[in-house]
Structures are given as C-alpha cells and as structure tokens.
C-alpha cells in the first residue's frame, strides 16, 4: 500500500509504533498520532498471542484454542456452581433432595473425565519439557 507521501505504510501498527512510544505514551495519544481518521490505508491492528508453546502443539489452530477456552470456562463454572441445592437453614426444601440428582451425577462424571484428560495433557507437558 502506498501512503500519501509515496512511501509504503507498515503492515501493522506494531511495525509503525516504536517500543519506546508504546511504553511512554497513553492510549489516547497513540490513537491520535498513529490511527488515521480518513480511512486511507490504515495499518492493521495486532493482538499478542499469549498461548504457551505447549498448547500450540496441542491446539495448533485458532478454532481449537477457542474451543479449549470455552470448555475450560464451562468446567470452571461447573466446579463453582454445581454444588447441591440445599436450604440455608433447616431441612431440605421440597424441591431439593438429600441424594445427588441425575444431573449432578452427570456433571460429576463429566468433571472426572475432564480431569483425567487434563492430567494426561499435564503428563505430556512434563514429557515434552523433560
């Protein structure tokens, strides 16, 4: 892409903004200085990939990484909120049971399976790092 002065623009804003400016200036001043408002050949925005190298081996595509994040978020919510429903004081309310319901058992089984898979990945991680 050619700029207005006949010089080529960098492909990304990372190429255009010096590291010292990134560390010293505010986001507003960087925006005002480096982002064009007329839409003429703006540089692309970049996002840092913060995925550990071990996960790059296991999840090479962006889709696989997003699926992994989705599954781990679901697991975290299950671990947080899957406890039995009990009344705060006194005996169990009519809509709750003292024994685990079918849904609770299914969640517990899924949690155990997921923990087993994660343990295998951690074992693989130790082998790769070893």
Curated annotation (Swiss-Prot):
The keyword RNA-binding does not apply. Pfam families: Herpes_UL33. Keywords: Host nucleus, Viral genome packaging, Viral release from host cell. It comes from the Viruses. It comes from Human herpesvirus 2 (strain HG52). Belongs to the herpesviridae TRM2 protein family. The keyword S-adenosyl-L-methionine does not apply. This is Tripartite terminase subunit 2. It is found in: Host nucleus. InterPro entries: Herpes_TT2 (IPR005208). Associates with TRM1 and TRM3 to form the tripartite terminase complex. One of its GO terms (cellular component) is host cell nucleus.
